[in-house]
Amino acid sequence: MLLNFRLHPRLKEDCHLLGWLDRSYLLLSRNALFPWFILVPETEETEFHELEPIAQAELLDQINLLARFVATEYPIDKMNIGMIGNIVSQLHVHLVGRNHRDSCWPGVVWGYDGFKPYPPDEVERTVDRLIAAIPGRFRAWRAEATIRQK
């Protein structure tokens, strides 16, 4: 764990902070139109290819685990996975479950102006589903998270 690691302000603003998946922060986009999760590994590197091979393997494992969760828990036809970083240079991975009936299919979700907020209880249900689906690897964002973010 990096002692000085902080989430980029844009990620904090645009996402619900769910917890940690292994050594990565796990976020949920505030836009409930899509099951849109974001993994943020605790690293100072800004590009995937800059990570050590073991860190790359760990992140790929987390991506696969989270993708399986999304594919199991949501009615999706396609999983969009991307590491773009043009606006937020902090290394992060988008995992967006898509289906043929979503509001911007087949277009991309980036820059789409449709928005629907999550009801607070739905965010908590998502956390509970993650705890049940990924026991021992997902840790929910609780009091210790508030301390880490100060």
Named regions from a protein language model:
Residues 1-91, 95-150:
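HIT superfamily nucleotide-processing domains
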